[in-house]
A protein has these predicted regions:
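Substrate-binding groove/exosite segments of carbohydrate-active enzymes
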Residues: 1-7, 11-175
Length: 175
């Protein structure tokens, strides 16, 4: 659930706890696939992942906990993109989120760890590299080559920045 406490006000008497209802608010993502097998534990794991992902896209990009978090972390996106895009048609969500990543690249090619990004904090390669992995997975899952074409200049600029911190193809200490 996305709340810890509920305050009910302006009542003349306390309600019967059984009469209080909470409603699930979630994004109505189009289902891309389903899963069911003979192992009830695997089915329950799938259902928990499904429920979680369904509730994490309320702001137009995936977050780790929508009741608290308002930023789309690249690391969280990297951890969940393959599963999320397999379960749901998230092409519109990723189009929006990749636009946000495109908007936050800095003049020197560095990127923050979230998009949108309301402050100056930076991020490591796993977070910033989301512009590449999300573009690639979105193309692979939905077959839209324009995603790669649109974000290729941003990817190039970021990789140019990464190159400044690489020796023989390996990253050295990240700034």
């Amino acid at each position: 659930h996305g709340f810890r406490y509920v305050k009910i006000s302006n009542l003349y008497e306390a309600p019967n706890p059984a009469s209080v209802k909470a409603y699930l608010i979630h994004t109505d993502f189009e289902l891309n696939s389903g899963f069911e097998c003979s192992d009830t534990d695997l089915n329950r794991i799938h259902d928990m992942v499904f429920y979680t992902l369904q509730c994490l896209g309320l702001g137009g990009y995936l977050v780790d906990c929508p009741q608290i978090e308002r930023l789309g972390y690249g690391g969280d996106g990297n951890a969940s993109t393959v599963t999320a895009q397999t379960m749901f048609n998230l092409a519109p969500l990723y189009s929006n989120w990749l636009d946000a990543w495109s908007d936050v690249i800095r003049e020197d090619g560095s990127m923050p760890h979230t998009a949108p990004n309301p402050y100056s904090a930076g991020g490591g390669p796993y977070w910033c590299g989301f512009i590449i992995s999300a573009s690639w997975h979105t193309y692979q899952n939905y077959g839209d080559i324009s995603v790669l074409e649109k974000y290729y200049p941003v990817m190039q600029k970021w990789l140019g920045y990464v190159e400044k911190y690489s020796v023989d193809g390996l990253l050295k200490r990240w700034p």
